[in-house]
């Protein structure tokens, strides 16, 4: 079992027979005073500082930024992890100072979706809870507001059991104190993970990467569909809505000549109308495809006319739908473009 740094700090203080308030001083230094190194924690005794540095290293964060790219409203940070693996995190800036963060959960990804650059890397390993949350801690320590978080970076979050430890850390009022409703988890349809999320974090926003209403085509585009078929995932999502009463998001990447036909739109309408009393809580986000030269099969985004036709069919049939605005595609910071392998 991997204990988080916060649990390890508590144990270290207990082992040194120091009073409990020393832990509270560390947490205050990190989350209230934005102190990024243990050496600068002026309220701590020297003996404790040395022990913290020996255990964790000089920095509070285990993620080390090695490169940054900026384009308009998007910043992409390449982080190095303690074992040398690298992941990417995206910071999106909106009007009135709102900041959103797209974070990674795995080094690489083993699911091989045909249109996704990350999937070409294969699965290297799961990120630890500290590595997941330290992506955000880095930004917090540098004065950013963590207004909303999405697990839409590298990897499939629900395939990493450490995700749930990370969510507990993010939700802990003494640490990050993030409301569940400010967190979104995107999944390709890992049913055991969906069920666990339903019961442990019912207020977290859930987004399902759909991309085709047809089982055979979805299996071709997303091999995970052979293990977790669309119809079985939809049943799990119905149960999630039944249990939580929360809106559920369906992501649909628009691929020119692949999944953007009238037949696809009509099949999607039928799929959602079959949800019965839960149909009104499904919302479809149509996403222009972000081109990448990393995938063996090449795709292009549907044009605006085709996307409007698709959206109009859904809307005319009472389906909640919107076309999502994308940021950062010119620096490979948009959905499906993250690689984390090279200096950016």
From Swiss-Prot:
Reaction proceeds by a ping-pong mechanism involving intermediate methylation of a conserved cysteine residue. Disulfide bonds join 102-335. The active site is at 88 (proton acceptor), 335 (s-methylcysteine intermediate). It catalyses: adenosine(2503) in 23S rRNA + 2 reduced [2Fe-2S]-[ferredoxin] + 2 S-adenosyl-L-methionine = 8-methyladenosine(2503) in 23S rRNA + 5'-deoxyadenosine + L-methionine + 2 oxidized [2Fe-2S]-[ferredoxin] + S-adenosyl-L-homocysteine. The gene is cfr. Binds 1 [4Fe-4S] cluster. The cluster is coordinated with 3 cysteines and an exchangeable S-adenosyl-L-methionine. [4Fe-4S] cluster binds at residues 109, 113, 116. The lineage of its organism: Bacteria, Bacillati, Bacillota, Clostridia, Lachnospirales. Residues 95-324 form the Radical SAM core domain. This is Ribosomal RNA large subunit methyltransferase Cfr. GO terms for cellular component: cytoplasm. Keywords: 4Fe-4S, Antibiotic resistance, Cytoplasm, Disulfide bond, Iron, Iron-sulfur, Metal-binding, Methyltransferase, rRNA processing, S-adenosyl-L-methionine, Transferase. It is found in: Cytoplasm. It is an enzyme of class 2 (transferase). GO terms for molecular function: 4 iron, 4 sulfur cluster binding; metal ion binding; rRNA (adenine) methyltransferase activity; rRNA binding. NCBIfam families: CfrAB, PRK14453.1, rSAM_Cfr. Its cofactor is [4Fe-4S] cluster. Its EC number is 2.1.1.224. It comes from Lachnoclostridium phytofermentans (strain ATCC 700394 / DSM 18823 / ISDg). Belongs to the radical SAM superfamily. RlmN family. Cfr subfamily. Specifically methylates position 8 of adenine 2503 in 23S rRNA. Confers resistance to some classes of antibiotics. S-adenosyl-L-methionine binds at residues 155-156, 186, 209-211, 290. One of its GO terms (biological process) is tRNA methylation.
């Amino acid at each position: 079992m991997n204990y988080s740094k916060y649990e390890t700090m508590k144990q270290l203080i207990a082992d040194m027979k120091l009073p409990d308030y020393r832990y509270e001083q560390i947490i205050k230094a990190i989350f209230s005073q934005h102190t990024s190194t243990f050496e600068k924690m002026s309220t701590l005794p020297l003996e404790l500082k040395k022990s913290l540095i020996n255990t964790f290293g000089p920095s509070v964060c285990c993620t080390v930024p090695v490169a940054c790219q900026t384009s308009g409203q998007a910043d992409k940070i390449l982080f190095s992890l303690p074992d040398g693996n690298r992941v990417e995190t995206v910071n999106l800036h909106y009007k009135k100072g709102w900041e959103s963060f797209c974070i990674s959960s795995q080094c690489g990804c083993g699911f091989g979706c045909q249109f996704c650059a990350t999937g070409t890397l294969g699965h290297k390993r799961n990120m630890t809870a500290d590595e997941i949350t330290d992506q955000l801690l880095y930004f917090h320590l540098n004065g950013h507001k963590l207004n909303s978080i999405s697990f839409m970076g590298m990897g499939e979050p629900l395939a990493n059991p450490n995700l749930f430890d990370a969510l507990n850390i993010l939700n802990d009022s003494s640490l990050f104190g993030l409301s569940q409703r400010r967190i979104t988890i995107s999944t390709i349809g890992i049913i055991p993970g969906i069920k666990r999320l339903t019961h442990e974090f019912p207020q977290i926003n859930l987004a399902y990467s759909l991309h085709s209403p047809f089982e055979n085509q979805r299996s071709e585009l997303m091999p995970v569909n052979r293990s977790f078929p669309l119809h079985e995932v939809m049943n799990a999502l119905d149960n999630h809505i039944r249990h939580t009463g929360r809106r559920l998001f369906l992501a649909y990447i628009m691929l020119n000549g692949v999944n953007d036909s009238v037949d696809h739109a009509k099949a999607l309408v039928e799929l959602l109308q079959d949800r019965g009393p839960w149909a009104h809580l499904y919302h479809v986000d149509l996403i222009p495809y972000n081109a990448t030269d990393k995938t063996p099969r090449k795709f292009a985004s549907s044009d605006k006319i085709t996307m409007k036709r698709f959206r109009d069919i859904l809307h005319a049939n009472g389906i909640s739908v919107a076309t999502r605005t994308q940021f950062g595609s010119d620096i490979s910071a948009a959905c499906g473009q993250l690689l984390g392998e090279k200096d950016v």
